[in-house]
């Protein structure tokens, strides 16, 4: 489960529904739950994590929620009963697994619960630690401690005015720490979300060892370590290779450096890069005046894929060796100042793209990022052109290294039309809101633009770019399979979602269909589903498991998710038999409303072909899903009224249908009664701006 960072209404509705269902489930289990804390936990995953997956809770998420987000965001006033953050999180985790909303790529339930146990010991101390509080929470509690009624807006305003005049006592040290943490980015914050990635297809590691072994860089680094050996080679007092050894090594490694007339190994750039690379990859080290092979690196040197991967990660530390100034007479380019960040963004841009990136588009996108990072207005047009050309040469050098090691491949060809559809001429005028339709991950390069450029100049740049892309073949850049694997590993390491076709082969049916519905395009969904079915051998049994998963999800009162699961099953079912599957479910006691809705949405079933009873089933299903999309009971009344006066008759007709979700229809009846001002028994309704769950006045403060 994931909602886009800007889709606040959709998230709020989904959060309301989840909390409503959670409280009902917990009540049935006899398990206490704090609805406000549960809402705050979901807020954390949506707003403050890079992937935003509500159903995936790794130990790092558990720890950050309990020891950082709750202390920062959840305000508990003096005399108020504290909320049970760890207990609520345990209940939420059990609920997600029980109703099959847990992400199949996350840890097992026991692993997540163990992380809660580990953090719980420190939770009370963290909640009381003012250094961890948010700024608004700090002042709210300070006001409450001094007798201010924080629910009285006027009283709180008077307190704020006194604080500004220096008439309020407060913990200056704690406030300084809070401000320092905010300024240095050491707090979980809103807006941490990164763009989702498309699923990728990769060979097995055993297959990838062959291209890794063929990598020029792997061969050179291995040879360098073997040359250094266990006995080591003498180096100068500055830690550099002696010139005689450097000449020998140039020949051994085939670096192509010209040694004639060179007096220092420092003047052999390609050799210097490889030596520094081997150091950063922990393959060699300098100690006591000698260059040694690292003994612990022997297993890495023996495995080409491990060696290649270590070299790839070390590349992010090679800024000076790769593009640094060679002497005091030279200066670094703009790329030097943002090297590691730009390398990451460029690779993320190339990752999972369905077609190769044209060099001119990538180059100009990087230029936009430079404009965001640097004040370029002071330079003349000629000087700016020189700055960009210098940075372009360094970017080329970076790509040369990526090509040599086998992470990137280049070819000549026509740019895909997708790269002609996005007008970047006004990109510098955009703030955090970037233009829609950018190639996936290209937003990472653009970031937040700086001051607006001359619109005419920007349009002229875009015109020149289009001419360049359409005039003929251009250089096209894409990641190799090795490069894709390496970038994916880095994405996963920082918590980003990077789906891999085949990774769901052991997933439970509900987890499989949920992931396919949310993250996979039709082609990769078909491939993933085919692999899942193949692993079970019995196709008929596999279909029963999948349809049972949809049936269970519908029974758990998550009908919109059940609909999405059935839809993706129909689209991805092998041999194009999805329509036959839906028609077979037309008479299913539980799934008929979902199947009929799917057939109707695809224009595979006309209104004339449906019976009166089926019309009522589809009508009832649409209303039940409307209630869910509105956030459950909390927002459904307004949603029903928004449908207009004919909605009364529609609800009345739906209530007379044979829809299998009788509990849902009963809830719909009560919601409709409240929506149109008649008396009814209230059911559910735990989330909302007015609370009835004993949250004790706790507020989120940002």
Feature-to-residue mapping (PLM):
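Extended, non-catalytic subsegments within catalytic or DNA/protein-binding/adaptor domains
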Residues: 100-164
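N-terminal core-binding DNA-recognition domain of tyrosine recombinases/integrases
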Residues: 20-127
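Accessory beta->alpha helical hairpin/"wing" motif in late/C-terminal subdomains of nucleic-acid enzymes
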Residues: 103-118, 272-274, 281, 285-333, ...
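Short, amphipathic alpha-helical interface elements at domain boundaries
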Residues: 34-55, 59-71, 164-273, 291, ...
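Short Lys/Arg-rich cationic patches that frequently serve as NLS/NoLS or arginine-rich RNA/DNA-binding motifs
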Residues: 680-702
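Charge-dense, extended regions
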Residues: 138-141, 145, 152-181, 651-657, ...
């Amino acid at each position: 489960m994931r909602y886009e960072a800007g889709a606040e209404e959709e998230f709020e509705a989904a959060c309301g529904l989840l909390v409503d269902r959670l409280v009902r489930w917990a009540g049935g289990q006899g398990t206490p739950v704090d609805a406000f804390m549960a809402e705050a936990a979901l807020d954390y995953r949506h707003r403050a994590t890079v992937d935003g997956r509500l159903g995936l809770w790794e130990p790092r998420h558990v720890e950050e929620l309990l020891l950082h987000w709750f202390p920062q965001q959840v305000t508990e006033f003096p005399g108020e009963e504290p909320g049970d953050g760890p207990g609520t999180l345990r209940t939420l985790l059990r609920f997600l697994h029980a109703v099959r909303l847990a992400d199949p790529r996350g840890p097992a339930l026991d692993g997540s619960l163990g992380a809660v146990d580990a953090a719980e010991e420190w939770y009370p101390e963290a909640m009381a630690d003012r250094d961890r509080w948010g700024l608004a929470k700090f002042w709210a509690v300070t006001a409450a401690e001094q007798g201010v009624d924080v629910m009285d807006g006027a009283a709180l305003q008077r307190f704020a005015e006194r604080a500004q005049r220096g008439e309020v006592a407060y913990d200056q040290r704690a406030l300084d720490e809070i401000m320092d943490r905010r300024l240095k980015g050491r707090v979980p914050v809103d807006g941490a979300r990164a763009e989702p990635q498309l699923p990728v297809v990769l060979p097995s590691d055993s297959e990838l060892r062959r291209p890794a072994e063929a990598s020029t860089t792997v061969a050179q680094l291995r040879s360098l370590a073997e040359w250094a050996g266990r006995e080591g080679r003498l180096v100068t007092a500055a830690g550099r290779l002696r010139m005689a050894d450097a000449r020998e090594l140039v020949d051994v490694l085939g670096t192509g450096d010209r040694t004639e007339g060179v007096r220092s190994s420092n003047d052999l750039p390609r050799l210097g890069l490889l030596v520094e690379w081997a150091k950063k990859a922990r393959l060699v080290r300098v100690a006591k005046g000698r260059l040694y092979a690292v003994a612990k690196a022997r297993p890495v040197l023996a495995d080409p894929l491990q060696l290649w991967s270590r070299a790839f990660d070390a590349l992010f530390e090679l800024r000076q060796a790769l593009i640094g100034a060679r002497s005091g007479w030279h200066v670094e380019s703009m790329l030097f100042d943002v090297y590691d960040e730009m390398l990451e963004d460029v690779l993320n841009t190339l990752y999972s793209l369905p077609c190769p990136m044209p060099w001119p588009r990538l180059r100009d996108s990087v230029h936009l990022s430079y404009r965001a990072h640097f004040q370029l207005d002071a330079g003349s047009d000629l000087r700016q052109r020189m700055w960009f050309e210098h940075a372009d040469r360094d970017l080329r050098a970076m790509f040369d290294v990526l090509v040599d090691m086998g992470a990137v491949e280049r070819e000549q060809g026509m740019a895909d039309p997708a790269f002609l559809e996005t007008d970047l001429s006004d990109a510098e005028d955009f703030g955090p809101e970037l233009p829609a339709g950018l190639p996936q991950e290209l937003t990472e390069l653009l970031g937040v633009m700086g001051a607006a450029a001359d619109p005419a100049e920007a349009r002229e740049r875009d015109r020149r770019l289009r001419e360049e892309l359409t005039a003929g073949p251009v250089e096209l850049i894409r990641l190799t399979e090795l490069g894709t694997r390496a970038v994916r590993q880095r994405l996963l390491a920082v918590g980003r979602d990077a789906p891999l076709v085949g990774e769901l082969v052991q997933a439970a049916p509900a987890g499989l269909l949920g992931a396919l519905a949310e993250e996979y395009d039709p082609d990769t969904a078909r491939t993933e589903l085919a692999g899942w079915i193949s692993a079970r051998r019995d196709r008929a049994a596999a279909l029963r498991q999948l349809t049972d998963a949809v049936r269970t999800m519908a029974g758990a009162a998550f009908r919109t998710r059940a609909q999405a699961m059935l839809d993706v099953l129909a689209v991805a079912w092998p041999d194009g038999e999805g329509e036959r599957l839906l028609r077979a479910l037309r008479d299913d006691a539980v799934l008929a409303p979902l199947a009929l809705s799917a057939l109707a949405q695809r224009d595979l079933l006309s209104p004339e072909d449906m019976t009166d009873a089926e019309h009522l089933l589809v009508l009832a299903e649409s209303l039940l899903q409307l209630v869910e999309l509105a956030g459950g009971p909390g927002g459904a009344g307004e949603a029903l009224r928004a449908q207009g006066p004919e909605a009364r008759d529609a609800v009345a007709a739906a209530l007379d249908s044979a829809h299998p979700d009788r509990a849902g229809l009963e809830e719909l009846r009560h919601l409709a009664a409240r929506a149109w001002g008649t008396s009814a028994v209230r059911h559910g309704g735990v989330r909302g701006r007015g609370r009835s769950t004993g949250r004790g006045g706790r507020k989120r403060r940002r």
